[in-house]
C-alpha cells in the first residue's frame, strides 16, 4: 500500500540494476524509474560528510579540532537536561563528533527530552510552527538546535551532520549548494542532484505522502519545500534520483572516492564502539 518504490543495487565492478514499481503519486499515474527525482531526506548526510572530509583532506580543519575556534556559535548551544533546564557544555565539539552522532545534537523524534520541550502537532507529529523559530545554526528541519549531552559522552541520531554543513560553509566560504555542486556532483556527473535543481526536475519530483493516523489512508502531503532554497540544510535538503545516488555510492565502493577525498578512510572504520546499551 505505497504509491511507488525504486530498488537498485551497485557493485564494485560498476554494475547497476534498478527495479521500479508504481506511479509518481496516488494522484498522478506517471510511471516512476531510476531517473525520477526524489527529496532524499537524510541520504543527504552522506554527501555532507563527504564534503566535510574534503575539507579535512585540504587541511582546512582536522577531525578532532575544537570547532568553536572557527564556529564560535557552538558555545551558545546549551545542554537540555531531563528536568527541562539548560546548562553550559563542558567540552568543545569536533567535526568527528558531528559526523558520527556523538555531539549531543538530537531530533525531537529521537529524543524524548526534546519532544517534551516542544509542542507537537497531533495531526502530523511535527512541532507546531511557533515551536520552530528561525535560527542561525541549522536551518530546514525540526526545532532550534538543542543538545542533550556533552560532546563525546553518548550517541544519538540527530542534527549533527546538519551543523557540520554550517561548518563547511564557514570554512569554504561557499554555501552548501555551490560547494557540493562544484566538488561532488559535477565531478561525478550527477546532473540531476542538488539543493536547487531545474524547474524541469521540480515538475517531475515525486511528492511525499502522509498516512492518516485515524484512517490509515495515504494522501499527497502539502509541498512545504520552496522551489528555490536560499539556505541549505546538510542533513536532509537534497533532491536526487536513484540513478544519480547510485553513482555516488558506486564511487565509494570502487575506491574512486580517492578522486574526491582520501580522508574517507578516517571515517570508514567504526568510530563509535559502544555507548550505554548500544
Each model region followed by its residue ranges:
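Short secondary-structure junction motifs
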Residues: 2-4, 58, 62-64, 142, ...
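Short, surface-exposed loop or secondary-structure junction motifs
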Residues: 18, 78-278
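A general secondary-structure junction signal
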Residues: 9-11, 71, 197-199
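Acidic helix-start/capping segments at beta-turn-to-alpha-helix junctions
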Residues: 68-77
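Short, conserved catalytic-motif segment at the N-terminal edge
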Residues: 1-40, 60-62, 76-85, 223
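Alpha-helix N-cap and coil->helix boundary residues
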Residues: 4, 62-69, 175-179
Amino acid at each position: 500500500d505505497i504509491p511507488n518504490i525504486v530498488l537498485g543495487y551497485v557493485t564494485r565492478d560498476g554494475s547497476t540494476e534498478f527495479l521500479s514499481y508504481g506511479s509518481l503519486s496516488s494522484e498522478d499515474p506517471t510511471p516512476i524509474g531510476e531517473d525520477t527525482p526524489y527529496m532524499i531526506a537524510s541520504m543527504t548526510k552522506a554527501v555532507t560528510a563527504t564534503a566535510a572530509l574534503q575539507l579535512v583532506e585540504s587541511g582546512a580543519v582536522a577531525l578532532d579540532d575544537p570547532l568553536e575556534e572557527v564556529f564560535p556559535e557552538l558555545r551558545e548551544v546549551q545542554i537540555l537536561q531531563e528536568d527541562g533546564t539548560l546548562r553550559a557544555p563542558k567540552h568543545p565539539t569536533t567535526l568527528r563528533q558531528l559526523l558520527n552522532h556523538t555531539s549531543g545534537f538530537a531530533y525531537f523524534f529521537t529524543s524524548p527530552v526534546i519532544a517534551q520541550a516542544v509542542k507537537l502537532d497531533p495531526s502530523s507529529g511535527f512541532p507546531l510552527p511557533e515551536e520552530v523559530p528561525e535560527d542561525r545554526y541549522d536551518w530546514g528541519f525540526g526545532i532550534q538546535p538543542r543538545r542533550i549531552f556533552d560532546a563525546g559522552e553518548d550517541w544519538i541520531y540527530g542534527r549533527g551532520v546538519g551543523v557540520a554543513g554550517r561548518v563547511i560553509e564557514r570554512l569554504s566560504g561557499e554555501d552548501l549548494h555551490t560547494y557540493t555542486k562544484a566538488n561532488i556532483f559535477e565531478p561525478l556527473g550527477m546532473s540531476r542532484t542538488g539543493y536547487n535543481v531545474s524547474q524541469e526536475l521540480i515538475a517531475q519530483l515525486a511528492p511525499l505522502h502522509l498516512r492518516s493516523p485515524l484512517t490509515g489512508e495515504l494522501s499527497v502531503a502539502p509541498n512545504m519545500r520552496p522551489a528555490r532554497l536560499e539556505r541549505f540544510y546538510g542533513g536532509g535538503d537534497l533532491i536526487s534520483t536513484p540513478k544519480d545516488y547510485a553513482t555516488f555510492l558506486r564511487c565509494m565502493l570502487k575506491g574512486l572516492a580517492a578522486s574526491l577525498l582520501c580522508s574517507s578512510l578516517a571515517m570508514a572504520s567504526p568510530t563509535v564502539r559502544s555507548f550505554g546499551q548500544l
